[in-house]
């Protein structure tokens, strides 16, 4: 499994290097324990502010296929219900996240919060420009949700840059 790092999913990689960090954001994050804390596997964490709900929006620099999600979190304060949305033109607000139908909904158990890959419906996550997670509640129903680490496992979609093509024959603008 060389070149796959710690993903433990054959043929896929951690997609963190494809994040467009300027386009990533989190709603209802606490000032002291913000969103960036959960993007690295470190002792810090992301924590919700006013209540247990969070909306995390991650954009990618190029289209990706997402196979699975990895979460590390406290067994009491970790997420329980997560709604996943893809390719939204704007970040969801909490009312929309509650009412819109997600691409997939995950109901997590404490054992899902140990950092092992949680498989997604791969066919539904094929051409992903951005993904938004609505964390509806946490394991214990406490006021704050915490996430120590969040990552997506998948692969980049090869894109064609039309500027890289060279004319084969004929003159510019000439048809067959």
Question: Language-model features: where?
Answer:
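Disordered, acidic Ser/Thr/Pro-rich linker "stalks" and the adjacent N-terminal cap
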Residues: 1-59, 168-176
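Extracellular carbohydrate recognition and processing domains
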Residues: 97-120
């Amino acid at each position: 499994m060389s070149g796959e790092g710690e993903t433990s999913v054959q043929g896929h990689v951690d997609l963190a290097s494809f994040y467009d960090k300027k386009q990533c954001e989190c709603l209802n994050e606490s000032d002291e324990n913000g969103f960036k804390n959960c993007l690295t596997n470190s002792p810090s964490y992301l924590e919700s502010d006013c209540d247990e709900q969070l909306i995390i929006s991650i954009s990618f620099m190029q289209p990706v296929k997402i196979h699975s999600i990895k979460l590390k979190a406290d067994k009491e304060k970790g997420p329980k219900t997560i709604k996943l949305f893809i390719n939204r033109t704007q970040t969801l607000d909490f009312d929309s996240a509650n009412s819109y139908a997600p691409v997939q909904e995950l109901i997590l158990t404490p054992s899902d919060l140990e950092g092992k890959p949680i498989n997604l419906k791969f066919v539904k996550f094929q051409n992903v420009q951005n993904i938004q997670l609505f964390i509806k509640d946490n394991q214990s129903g406490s006021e704050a949700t915490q996430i120590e680490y969040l990552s997506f496992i998948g692969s980049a979609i090869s894109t064609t840059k039309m500027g890289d093509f060279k004319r084969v024959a004929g003159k510019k603008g000439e048809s067959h």
